[in-house]
């Protein structure tokens, strides 16, 4: 059974991100149907293997058997699936809730597919050294295509037949830029942490190159979600890896290399006479800003600590450094919260520019995500008690926005409408209710907590934890859909698989 799961996971991280049939015209449905086919083949193959070997004991199986209790992560996805069923049954748009046709196809059928593959992968997958390398190589290809397209180089001719005004909306073999950013927040953390933990030089080279290229893709995709997820990732990694001097030195080195690739992009832009699709505020600072001092400090300090830890045999970082970094992180977070509250509730008149705009929440915040979030809360407050508990129907947020007149308001405000909240958690709060949203959060948070605990005995668990954290944070400003969510479910399933291994 383990071999079947390995093949499925390998295809999900190689074939799936690269597959598209007709450029960007049907890309969401291409990925949707590809996932359905792969999931169906997994179920069929697993069923055949079970029928053949059901009476044979797998002596190599170290995974807890079915007599063991479900984990909190299991209960989370079970509750989420149950809420999706109830939501569909009580919805005014039952068929659309089933298919997700009113939104991004994240309907009950797709949620059922998530549910099935999660339990298959979490129970049958066996660790394989080839899978992460395949993931790293594929993600590098996907990200590199995106970097080239940022400068109007289109190696796969994906923009053929599109107007130039649409170029800025789509990128690489993933599609929409926000979805591309979500993909990168899954794979970049995997490559980055694998670089930190790998002992063999060839693995460090592969994962290091992949981490750098995928970070370059994040810089070029111009999406708030990927920047938010990356900030959360780095905060987590610096706090987690500070305890081990060797790991911390590797983190400093990969940080410097990621900053260096921003300068490589800068010089490439110079060669191209700055003929690009442009960079947002934070990305522009990374590319064009004077970050050479930071690069030098992180690189030199990382190399010094790496050599020092090997020569002196010191593995633990001095406690004063650990506590100082944690204190600095808390201080910066507190200052950020203070600035956000001050410019949102007290000083609402001062003009804010660049990245400072994120510290004032209003209808225009985050490409008018503020408008959608505020109306999303209004929707939740106005539906009946049953809908508060179980939602209005899977992926029906946009239709409810229309029914309550909020899409008309959005059209008057920004000359467009929306079919999603652009916040995974708020979207689920409306569509599958309190029960579904809390179940989903339980599914994610419990996997992270258990993964961190498990990493004390198996450091490689933190590779998957980093990916889950990064994607979950970017989800605050993004949406679930059939392009990246299946990959995220696979990551959580792999983490659950590791969490269930007996000590």
Language-model-detected regions and their locations in the chain:
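Membrane-interfacial, low-structure loops and terminal tails that flank and connect transmembrane helices
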Residues: 55-70, 277-280, 308-324
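Alpha-helical transmembrane segments of multi-pass inner-membrane proteins
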Residues: 4-22, 37-50, 78-91, 107-120, ...
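Short, hydrophobic transmembrane alpha-helix segments
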Residues: 19-32
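Membrane-interfacial loop-to-helix junctions in multi-pass inner-membrane proteins
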Residues: 64-74, 126-136
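Non-cytosolic membrane-interface motifs at loop->transmembrane helix junctions
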Residues: 31, 98-107
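Membrane-interface helix caps and helix-loop-helix hairpins in membrane proteins
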Residues: 96-101, 219-224, 475-481
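Transmembrane alpha-helix boundary signature
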Residues: 47-67, 87-99, 154
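Interfacial juxtamembrane loops and adjacent helix segments
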Residues: 149-174, 349-367, 374, 383-430
């Amino acid at each position: 059974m383990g071999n079947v799961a390995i093949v499925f996971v390998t295809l999900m991280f190689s074939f799936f991100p690269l597959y598209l049939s007709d450029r960007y015209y049907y890309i969401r449905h291409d990925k949707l149907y590809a996932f359905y086919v792969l999931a169906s083949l997994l179920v069929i193959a697993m069923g055949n293997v079970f029928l053949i070997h059901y009476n044979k004991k797998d002596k190599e199986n170290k995974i807890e058997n079915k007599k063991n209790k479900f984990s909190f992560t299991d209960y989370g996805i079970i509750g989420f699936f149950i809420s999706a069923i109830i939501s569909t049954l009580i919805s005014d748009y039952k068929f659309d809730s089933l298919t997700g046709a009113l939104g991004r196809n994240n309907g009950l059928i797709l949620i059922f597919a998530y549910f099935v593959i999660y339990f298959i992968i979490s129970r049958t997958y066996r660790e394989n050294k080839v899978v992460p390398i395949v993931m790293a190589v594929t993600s590098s290809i996907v990200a590199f295509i995106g970097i080239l397209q940022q400068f109007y180089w289109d190696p796969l001719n994906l923009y053929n037949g599109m107007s130039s005004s649409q170029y800025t909306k789509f990128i690489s073999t993933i599609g929409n830029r926000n979805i591309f950013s979500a993909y990168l927040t899954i794979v970049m953390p995997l490559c980055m942490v694998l670089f930190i933990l790998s002992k063999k030089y060839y693995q460090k080279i592969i994962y290091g190159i992949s981490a750098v290229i995928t970070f370059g893709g994040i810089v070029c995709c111009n999406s708030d979600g990927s920047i938010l997820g990356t900030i959360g990732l780095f905060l987590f990694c610096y706090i987690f890896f500070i305890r081990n001097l060797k790991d911390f030195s590797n983190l400093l080195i990969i940080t410097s290399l990621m900053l260096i690739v921003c300068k490589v992009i800068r010089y490439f832009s110079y060669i191209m006479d700055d003929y690009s699709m442009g960079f947002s505020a934070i990305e522009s600072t990374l590319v064009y800003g004077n970050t050479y001092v930071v690069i030098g400090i992180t690189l030199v300090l990382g190399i010094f600590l790496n050599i020092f830890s090997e020569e002196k045999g010191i593995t633990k970082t001095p406690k004063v450094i650990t506590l100082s970094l944690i204190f600095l992180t808390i201080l910066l977070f507190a200052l950020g919260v203070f600035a956000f509250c001050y410019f949102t509730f007290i000083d609402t008149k001062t003009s804010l520019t660049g990245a400072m705009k994120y510290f004032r929440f209003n209808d225009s915040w985050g490409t008018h995500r503020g408008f959608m979030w505020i109306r999303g809360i209004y929707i939740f407050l106005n539906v009946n008690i049953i809908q508060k508990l179980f939602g209005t129907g899977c992926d029906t947020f946009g239709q409810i926005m229309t029914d309550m007149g909020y899409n008309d308001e959005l059209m008057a405000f920004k000359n467009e409408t929306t079919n999603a909240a652009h916040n995974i958690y708020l979207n689920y709060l409306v569509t599958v209710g309190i029960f579904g949203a809390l179940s989903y959060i339980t599914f994610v948070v419990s996997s992270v907590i258990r993964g961190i605990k498990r990493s004390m005995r198996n450091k490689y668990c933190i590779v998957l934890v980093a990916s889950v954290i990064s994607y979950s944070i970017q989800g605050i400003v993004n949406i679930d859909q059939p392009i990246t969510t299946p990959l995220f479910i696979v990551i959580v399933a792999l983490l659950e698989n590791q969490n269930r291994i007996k000590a």
